[in-house]
A protein has these predicted regions:
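Bacterial N-terminal signal peptides that target proteins for export
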Residues: 1-10
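Bacterial N-terminal signal peptides
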Residues: 9-18
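Boundary at the C-terminal end of the N-terminal hydrophobic targeting segment
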Residues: 19-24
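N-terminal mature-domain "stem" immediately C-terminal to a signal peptide or N-terminal signal-anchor/transmembrane
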Residues: 25-85
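Auxiliary, metal-adjacent structural segments of Zn-dependent hydrolase domains
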Residues: 69-127
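Active-site scaffold of zinc-dependent metalloenzymes
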Residues: 115-149, 158
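Catalytic Zn2+-binding segment of zinc metalloproteases
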Residues: 152-169
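Metalloprotease/metallohydrolase-associated module, dominated by Zn2+-dependent proteases
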Residues: 169-317
Length: 322
């Protein structure tokens, strides 16, 4: 090539680089070895399993050990089919420009893992930088993208700093507790969420003239596995704890005589939705509420009852107007 042609080629390549989305991230299916390492990792989730967690996840009345759960998780890993991999690749390609806009928030690589029923009943979730899908992808592409973006928020949230995560949760009024003191019998009934890095957050709502600090808390009911209830999600019972905030943001359950310590969702839904928005009923944790709103943001929803949540989230993530 002549010097002129080389110069023209360089200019054209430069223009193409500006025209294409600057996506640094890789989205791909995990290898078997990567998947095993991720689902059996001794992360905060596996280190903090409760007796209820082990019983219902292992489907064993007497419970078990984290080592047994790791073995169950590993055995439940399933290879992707060519058709499934093609659908995931096509989804990423369709969303390349949007994903490029998130590059500052995401890890360099996001992995896709296919899990069976032995991994938390097949419920999609995340671990580390991986999205763990269930045994089957949603049939409709729109549903797949909604699920993908919901789970991608968890990867984003996990990758960011605690201060940035606090800032995200603060968009809907949640504040961190430096420590939480709960009765052992209550803590032992808790169901851990692998998507949540830190469950210790409260939101202040109107308690009928006085502010009340609420903490969403997922419990197991019953708290031990029952063969008559083989479905993992059928054990979920969400409650809201009445929390007292003390010095240096220490938190504890209110136990004063004549004061309600634990609320049902129905008892607090009005003031709660006034604070966090009514776009989703997924209020197990600020993380899950924001994940749904993030998915709505990324899929272009504009018909939600509280678009202010979407607007705040877009601004915080520095995304362009939809």
């Amino acid at each position: 090539m002549t010097r002129n042609w080389l110069q023209l080629f360089a200019i054209a390549a430069s223009l193409m680089a500006f025209a294409l989305p600057a996506q640094a991230q890789t989205f791909r299916a995990a290898t078997r070895g990567e998947a095993v390492d991720i689902v059996t990792a001794d992360d905060g989730y596996l280190r903090n399993l409760t007796p209820a967690d082990l019983s219902i996840r292992l489907q064993a009345r007497d419970g078990g050990t984290p080592a047994q759960l790791k073995a169950q998780y590993e055995a439940a890993l399933t290879p992707w089919t060519e058709a499934e991999t093609a659908r995931l690749d096509a989804m990423v390609a369709r969303n390349a420009e949007k994903l490029a806009g998130l590059s500052a928030w995401l890890p360099d690589e996001v992995l896709f893992i296919k899990g069976g029923r032995g991994i938390d009943g097949g419920l999609p979730h995340t671990r580390a930088n991986a999205i763990v899908f269930g045994p089957a992808l949603p049939m409709a592409d729109a549903e797949l993208e909604q699920l993908f973006y919901h789970e991608l928020f968890h990867v984003l949230s996990r990758r960011t700093s605690p201060a940035a995560r606090d800032s995200l949760y603060g968009l809907i009024g949640f504040e961190r507790c430096a420590s939480v003191t709960l009765p052992p019998n209550l803590r032992g009934r808790g169901v851990s969420n692998p998507d949540v890095e830190d469950g210790a957050f409260t939101v202040e709502v109107d308690g009928g003239g006085e502010p009340v600090d609420l903490m969403p808390f997922l419990t197991a009911s019953p708290e031990r596995y029952d063969p008559a209830k083989p479905s993992f999600p059928s054990y979920f019972q969400l409650v809201f704890l009445n929390i007292k905030r003390g010095p240096r943001d220490t938190c504890s359950l209110v136990t004063a005589t004549g004061v309600t310590s634990i609320f049902s969702p129905g008892a607090v839904q009005g003031p709660l939705f006034a604070k966090v928005g009514r776009n989703t009923h997924y209020v197990f944790h600020a993380e899950e509420t924001l994940a749904d709103n993030f998915a709505y943001l990324m899929t272009g929803r504009s018909d939600l009852p509280d678009m202010w949540v979407i607007d705040k989230l877009r601004a915080r993530l520095a995304l362009p107007p939809g």
